[in-house]
Design a protein with these regions (language model features):
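N-terminal secretory signal peptides that target proteins for export/translocation
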Residues: 1-7
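Bacterial N-terminal signal peptides
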Residues: 11-23
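Carbohydrate-interacting regions of secretory-pathway proteins
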Residues: 25-278
Length: 278
């Protein structure tokens, strides 16, 4: 009889321990649903605690793939594609009519004297990816050697130029913020090879005619940082100081026809939003 009592007492103890362990696991699982804390300090200027488990989770995307010289990469899944190698449906001529550059072999080629083209999309703060290539046969010199440009709002220009073993004024070479800042380094590949610009653009802000916040460029040329949060001084100008002129918070992206048959491919952008935005 004593043996039976001891056995049942042992079973009871195991059940009690098991229940306690299960409750602890349940409590831990409930705590981990938020993967964070609510008893930590609130971050300055915001409403979120440090390690706040109720803060919105970042959107999950497919990051895409890198380009090779032979094949353009795959854009991120949340990118807005401006040119996928098929047509110019996202572009227009300067007069608003159809863009008349040539599309061949998965790239668009400037038709010299056809005029610059602009996106139908109006774009604000963004990450822009664009690939370009100069003709393999080198012609011209200085600013006449494969000249084009990527102009945000048609006014803030990142220069496109064949700057491989070719000199020009520094704030006018490839990847320069034209007329303002030369690139930190010259990362230009040989003519005929594909070059890559990854550009982070922060739009200047105006209140009426007053500039309240300047614009900024961060630029990578072939994966190398050539501008690090560079403050814009205004519109890009030739032989004149940059100066600001008021404009809306969104505008077209322009690719410049400077009379040279520069090629472009794999053009896309991602809208840049504040933290915790859907």
């Amino acid at each position: 009889m004593k043996s039976t009592v001891k056995t049942w007492a042992g079973v009871g103890l195991l059940l009690t321990l098991g229940a306690g362990f299960g409750a602890a696991l349940t409590a831990r699982a409930q705590q981990q649903e938020h993967f964070g804390y609510q008893d930590t300090p609130i971050l300055p200027g915001g409403k979120w605690h440090v390690h706040d488990g109720t803060r919105p989770q970042p959107k999950v995307i497919d990051p895409g793939s890198f380009s090779s010289q032979e094949t353009p990469g795959k854009p991120p899944s949340d990118a807005i594609v401006l040119f996928d190698g098929k047509d110019l449906s996202h572009w227009k001529a300067g007069n608003g009519g159809p863009a008349t550059w040539t599309v061949q072999d998965g790239m668009m080629v400037i038709a010299p004297k056809a005029g610059s083209i602009a996106t139908k999309d109006e774009i604000g703060d963004c990450q822009l990816h664009i690939e370009w290539s100069e003709p393999t046969t080198v012609t011209g010199r200085d600013q006449g050697r494969g000249n084009s440009g990527v102009l945000f709002f048609g006014r803030y220009e990142i220069q496109v130029l064949d700057s491989f073993e070719s000199k020009t004024y520094p704030d006018g070479q490839a990847s320069a913020i034209y007329g303002t800042y030369p690139p930190l380094v010259n990362a230009t590949r040989k003519p005929g090879e594909w070059q890559v610009y990854d550009i982070l653009f922060t739009v200047p802000r105006f209140e009426g005619d007053k500039l309240v916040k300047p614009g900024y460029f961060t630029v990578l040329h072939n994966g190398v940082v050539v501008h690090n949060h560079a403050e814009l001084l205004g519109d890009s100008n030739h032989r004149a100081l940059p100066s600001y002129h008021p404009h809306p918070p969104k505008g077209s992206l322009v690719l410049q026809d400077h009379g040279n048959p520069v090629r472009y491919r794999n053009i896309w952008y991602r809208e840049l939003k504040d933290y915790d935005q859907p």
